[in-house]
Amino acid sequence: MSQYIAELCTLLVEDNFGELFGHIFATLIRYDRLTLPRLRLYSKLPDAQLRRGLAAMVQQHLVYHYTSYEEGVTYYEPNLQSAYYLIRAGKILEFIEERLGKYAATVMSTIMFLGHAQVSYLETLPELQPQAPTAVNGNHEQPEKEIEGEGVEGEGIEEEGHTNGVNGEEALEEQEEQAQPFLLHPTLKALAAHGYIHRVREAHFQSYADNVLDCERTIKARADIKQMKGKKLEETVLELTAEMLRERLDGDLTHGLVFNGVPRGAKRRRGPGGAERSNKKARVDYVAVDEDEEEEEENEWSEDEMGGDNIPMESGITVRVNYEKLDVALRNRRFLELAEQDCSAATIHVYECLLRRIEYKTKQCRDTPEIPREGEEGKQFAAPISLAAIAEDVDPSVDLAGSIGPMDPSQAVNRRGKRPLDDGVNGTHHDGPNGASSDGNRIYDVGQHLALLSEPPHNLTEKKVVANLPSWTVEFRSLACKLRHLELERMIEARYGDVALRVVRVLHAKGKLDEKRLQEISLLPFRVLRQVLASMQAGGFVDLQEVPRDAQRQPSRTIYLWFYDPDRTRASILEDTYKSMSRCLQRLRFERNRLKEFLEKTERSDVKGNEERYLSEAELTLLEQWRAKEALLLGEVARLDEMVAVMRDY
């Protein structure tokens, strides 16, 4: 455990949950694995306060606990990964709101705040209840409640319910009670179908190492395993341990909620310019919509939408946020940003449809908890997606043929290399209604866009043939490695210039080189090359290896080889990133404490939202400066978190 990640996680826990949580977490980080008496001794906290704090931290998944079978003693240790995800909460909620709507983001925020929660408890929370509609002049018109992005409409709610007096109030209360399950449960099922929440298992409260040791102990106690010896025993135990570990950690809730590889109710992704064609956003709206908008929206749902499924989720299920699945979704968003550098909007839309299909079938970014060393990581292909399935998800209004590039009519040839016949009317070809091409041509155009994405330098896609059908997939590990290299190269170029970037690329491609050979390949003067190498060596990006020619080890008889180790550089950059994030949070805390009294005044209920009325000109200027400074520091932390995700999580 490094110093700076421990410092960063302690700051995050203390800022989000208070000093008690921060003190317990810091004690566990300092002494690592402790029993309750030892933790009480080192933390110097009262027993009752410590027990309540530990119980709440276990609820938030900030602390692992494991009870030894031999001793019967419970050990506690910090969960750094869960503590770090506190910094990514805003990004996750923004993604959920964009994907599934505002109400889904509210539900996810509530689950994230509670750590984990039963469905029956979520039903009782007032913030998850639908807001009561307003009545005008005694007449009440019940607005239609709809979860855009999930195809869930408030069935059982009268569209036009005009009520008056006491009977009207009772009817309104009954309608609200009926609306609740049609709003919360479909949203939970939508989150579960996408994999963003999963069932809490007992193994989730134990560390990965404890789960592995427990599985190995259980397997080795079996009678058939005791009869094995040697290499066969090791291989069998390793295989069965991995299988048992997957079963214990599996909290998948997608069973019965996925149809043909797509979550039920998933909405077709709009193509470029789709937002301008529709005034409705992917969020929960509590306003009435006219019939034209309703018909337009209904045409965009998949055929197997969840709107007809009124079965609520089981009340006894305990759910939590599935951060591994969310990492997959955020990684796909980074791949889209990488593709946007060289591709058109239509190609990006096709690539997004492919990644969306792959996301539904991918549970985590990688199988191993740590990223293997450079060159030791094998290829890992995603589940292949058929070309026809991708074409079904593409927005029909997207011009696929024209976005690749028009051909000269005199030089136009078809797929067989022959000139097409002029079968149009007056020289004009009519593809279909609204200018749309036929299904066969559209599938071919989608394949052309995917083939364009498979070209160097990034090779974002790869074609496969499954059951004699063309399919496309993504090689995630090589793309994740490419993202890491691009991030390192961007940093090297920003610090040392393009000459240093050229030297690093040569060393990465050729391996260890002496100064003379490096100068010949990079075509740089010796003076410039030595200055760049010295500055990068001081920064830890390149290093020098001495290879003596004889046992005397004389400098004149020694070969000096320069090399670039991306793994060591990545680890060093990761530590520097943790340190920078920690310093940003410390600076933010210092600035907040310095303006504590003023900020308490601005956060009062009567002042908040009415700053111009209650604050002076000097105070308004100070508030504006504070908000700008806070946005700057938090924005820097979010940018650094993107770097951590690329270097560590993807």
Swiss-Prot record:
Residues 577-598 are annotated as: Leucine-zipper. Pfam families: HTH_9, POLR3C_WHD, RNA_pol_Rpc82. Gene3D superfamilies: Winged helix-like DNA-binding domain superfamily/Winged helix DNA-binding domain (1.10.10.10). The keyword Transcription applies. GO terms for cellular component: RNA polymerase III complex. Residues 149-158, 288-307 have a biased composition (Acidic residues). Keywords: DNA-directed RNA polymerase, Nucleus, Transcription, Zinc. It is found in: Nucleus. Residues 133-163, 264-283, 288-313, 400-440 are annotated as: Disordered. It comes from the Eukaryota. DNA-dependent RNA polymerase catalyzes the transcription of DNA into RNA using the four ribonucleoside triphosphates as substrates. Specific core component of RNA polymerase III which synthesizes small RNAs, such as 5S rRNA and tRNAs. Component of the RNA polymerase III (Pol III) complex consisting of 17 subunits. Belongs to the RNA polymerase beta chain family. This is DNA-directed RNA polymerase III subunit rpc3.
